[in-house]
Amino acid sequence: MARLLTSSSALRWRTITSSQPVLLRAYSSGSSDTEYLQRSIVPTMHFQKSLPRLPIPKFEDTIKRYLNAQRPLLDDVQFKKTEQLALNFQNGVGKQLHEELVQQDKQNKHTSYISGPWFDMYLCARDSIVLNSNPFMSFTPDPRPEYNSQLIRATNMTVSAMRFLKTMRAGYLEPEIFHLNPAKSDTLTFRKLIRFVPSSLSWYGAYMVNAYPLDMSQYFRLFNCTRIPKPNRDELLTDEKGRHLLVLRKGNFYVFDVIDKDGNIVKASEIQAHLQHILSDNTPTPEFPLGYLTSEERNKWAVLRQKLLDNENEEALAKVDSAVFCLCLDDFPIKDRVHLSHNMLHGSGLNRWFDKSFSIIMTEDGTAAINFEHSWGDGVAVLRFQNEVFKDSTQRPAISPESCSAPVDSSKAVQRLHFNLDDSLKAAITDAKTKFDTSVNALSIATMEFKKGGKEFLKTQKLSPDAISQLSFQMAFLRQYGKTTATYESCSTAAFKHGRTETIRPASIYTKKCSEALVMNPSKHSPAELRSMLHECSKYHGQLTKEAAMGQGFDRHLFALRHLASSKGLPIPEIYQDIPYAQINHNVLSTSTLTSPAVQLGGFAPVVPDGFGVGYGVHDDWIGCNVSSYPARDVRQFVQCVHQSLDDIFSVLQDKPLK
């Protein structure tokens, strides 16, 4: 169910107007010390108590939106049947379920109606989390080449990550806010005033100046957190007492403290010495690398983990689970963006522990990325962490190329973990590796860069850059496969307490009409007609985006109603047994976008065997996408078709003839 109902990755925040959101600048009470990133005068969780609750949409609106999304995917006969089933649901059992969901929500004001079901969806999913769940986001290289040495960058990022941890736990991290009118709200005056507004009212104070605080409830699971495999439903374990870092190299596991017993960050020169010790260690790769087990089917991994515990590995596993995070040091450089994507999304499996809340992966040439487990949180929290770590490690690096390691005995400070494996566990690791290799070898990745224009030009044309990107995917799929297909775009609902994501459904009657005109018969339409169609697409996509960000999509509402029926042991309502319902949730095009100065590239695998996983970004003067597929689709041809589609759109906008 998880693969049918969610994109692999929810990597973005959508604003609720067309204004460009501005990330909160750090106004601190002075932060020259090396322990913290900043010392915000507004406490980190100041707005959390007063965040608005995620609304449950009106039931009739959900049904209407669902049918609008189905219209471009169905012929008249199919649509009539689906429409009737939807209306029957609206006037029958669905109405009762909706009323019960509303009542349940009123009794649980501390959270959102989607939070529990969403955790269930992720944690009950039994497929491997590799490819099916974990995405990656790679860091932009340090602008100074000499700082991209693996040892220097790993040390600096580790220190910056610990500064983030300490800043957050001390309440000094700037609250996450998006400013729609920065001149009014992104100011020291605003901060000085808002910090004195009681936390039960603070959100309203921000709202009055068009500033939107975001939910930060996921942040505590960034560190010391691991997904633990259990039969039928996994658990999230967070142990904030852990002061050590987990480092993987050549499939070997090492731990050393990065926070001392007084709660201070261990000296950067000592961290450097310990990492140098690990990089110099000539211990061979284990014959049976344990990390492969985290790529197993979850029920099988749960059984194997219990076997590990029974074989006296409890202490070693506890070290892995409670580590602040996982640092994977790979012994090779990155060749190109496709190699980067494969390595950061899955790698060889040898040097990974996919269950950690996040891992920083760093190759020999200093190329770095975050691979994160998705059940605990979404891209908003991870991106904030990535932005802060990139900024701090490049602007305030703890060590430089001239720095010397501390004269400490790292052989005593660094512990290499040993695991006792019996024959059945060795066989299980071999089996897991075989399955892992088969899965990842089936994945293809292709990248595309369109250099003829981007956000700036599209804005001069009064067009939404995201709408145009999504239209190019619709056109590309039509050009390649001759039809319109189910499309998913993830959208954060972090503007609400315990919000997660909502779905934007970019395939519409407008994109279908426009795609068919541009791809199949552009000569039948005047340039003015084609431009008018582009504006129709942009306007409707903007409406869908605004609705989704405000919790007014249809996907999560229908999902919650189905979850409620299932939890009550009721028969599955007919609407959910309708073939078009399964088809619209079989997301052939699963898409997610983000742009940040800290992020070079992001990506994820398709969520269905015959799908594409489309990570994309619209920059000032170019548009890029990083796309994955399995053998059922031709990803290289698809990215060529996307490029051709963007070419055609920009030609129309520039009054050039279509090729």
Curated annotation (Swiss-Prot):
One of its GO terms (biological process) is fatty acid beta-oxidation. Residues 1-27 form a transit peptide. GO terms for cellular component: mitochondrial inner membrane; mitochondrion. Pathway: Lipid metabolism; fatty acid beta-oxidation. Transmembrane segments: none annotated. It comes from the Eukaryota. One of its GO terms (molecular function) is carnitine O-octanoyltransferase activity. Residues 181-210 dip into the membrane without crossing it. This is Carnitine O-palmitoyltransferase 2, mitochondrial. It comes from Xenopus laevis. The lineage of its organism: Eukaryota, Metazoa, Chordata, Craniata, Vertebrata.
